[in-house]
């Protein structure tokens, strides 16, 4: 007669043998949409390393290296530079909950979905939200921003660097000049831009910048690199009410991320941080200028090959993003059908348009590890077969 332990073990093995695991059906898909991007093989290997405790000395050393690597990538000396636990949207939420108080006048520059989302988050914090809107597919105009800033004082001005919904690169450097003169804090969404095009946080006068790991860093989604200037930290320290989100409170998180003695805040996503650490190592090994040149060259190759198929880019050349290409859908073409066939027949994923651009564009990503000539050619051959 089997013991209770043996019966239980037998039952567990029997269940394991008959229950299907849907992970067995996961296969390689060429991710050429607006994110996530293809993950570096070295990052997959890093994710599989044994999990350490979140206060283990070796893990603390890895955390410190991550901060240094992020500062190099963001071109900043900010002490408060760290990856938040959560996707890029957590980074956005963290930026606003730490810097915005009820009643603050906040100006959000909007030319796509993610600018609108910034305005919504600020509104939920009961800020006085003002928007300055531009046509989707066109950049924010610095002169228009400068004129608005002369009309009213704002506590904070927010803009998206790389508007993922449209493929537009906003001139955050020029915008920053006017924001600095106004005295407002300057908040920039770099979710898609970081690691794909140059970001100069300090030189551009940015007070708080956030990003995500799943775009040009070619790491799985789950972390939001963020950096905060001393000026922004001063506003945080001057708060007379608590930050309204405990999990994203930078004043608490910094006690875990810096200093000789670390204070527990929450259990860090250990293996995701391994992945980010390795992804940053991959970027630095290639060299920042080489990484930016690769994105630019693959964009130019894609545009040239799309042109041979009669396909056009929505955005004017001077403001195009190399890593996110908004491709106009030709008249009479079933854009959703093409996307479905690319995924089903060719294992290639591209994105659809959003908002007023829904049904009018495809969003083709060339982010991070995805930005390779072999991937561009594979997509072009698939489009040639399906159009």
Language model segments and positions:
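Active-site C-terminal subdomain of aminotransferase-like
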Residues: 38-39, 214-303
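Conserved active-site segment immediately N-terminal to the catalytic lysine
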Residues: 202-214
């Amino acid at each position: 007669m089997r013991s209770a332990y043996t019966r239980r073990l037998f039952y567990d093995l029997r269940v394991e043998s008959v229950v299907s695991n849907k992970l067995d059906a996961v296969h390689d898909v060429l991710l050429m949409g607006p994110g996530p991007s293809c993950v570096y093989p070295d990052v997959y290997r890093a994710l599989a390393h044994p999990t350490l405790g979140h206060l283990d000395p070796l893990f603390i050393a890895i955390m410190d290296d991550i901060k240094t690597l992020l500062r190099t990538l963001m071109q900043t000396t900010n002490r408060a530079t760290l990856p938040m636990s959560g996707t890029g949207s957590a980074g956005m939420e963290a930026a606003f909950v730490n810097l915005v108080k009820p009643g603050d006048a906040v100006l959000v520059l909007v030319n796509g979905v993610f600018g609108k989302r910034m305005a919504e988050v600020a509104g939920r914090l009961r800020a006085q939200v003002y928007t300055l809107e531009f046509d989707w597919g066109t950049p924010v105009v610095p002169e228009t921003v400068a004129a608005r800033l002369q009309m009213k004082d704002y506590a904070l001005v927010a803009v998206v660097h790389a508007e993922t919904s449209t493929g537009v690169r906003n001139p955050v450097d020029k915008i920053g000049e006017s924001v600095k003169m106004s005295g407002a804090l300057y908040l920039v969404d770099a979710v898609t831009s970081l690691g794909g095009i140059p970001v100069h946080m300090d030189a551009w006068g940015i007070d708080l910048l956030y990003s995500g790991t799943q775009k040009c860093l070619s790491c799985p989604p789950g972390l939001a690199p963020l950096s905060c200037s001393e000026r922004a930290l001063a506003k945080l320290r001057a708060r007379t009410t608590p930050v309204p989100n405990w999990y994203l409170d930078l004043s608490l998180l910094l006690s875990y991320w810096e200093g000789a003695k670390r204070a527990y805040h929450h259990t860090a996503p250990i293996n995701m941080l391994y992945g980010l650490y390795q992804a940053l190592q991959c970027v630095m090994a290639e060299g920042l200028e080489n990484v930016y040149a690769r994105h630019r060259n693959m964009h130019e190759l894609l545009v040239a090959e799309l042109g041979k198929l009669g396909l056009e880019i929505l955005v004017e050349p001077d403001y195009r993003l190399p890593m996110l290409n908004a491709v106009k859908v030709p008249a009479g073409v079933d854009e959703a059908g093409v996307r479905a066939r690319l995924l089903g027949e060719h294992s290639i994923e591209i994105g659809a348009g959003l908002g007023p651009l829904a049904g009018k564009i495809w969003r083709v990503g060339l982010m991070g590890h995805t930005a390779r000539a072999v991937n561009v050619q594979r997509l072009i051959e698939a489009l040639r077969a399906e159009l």
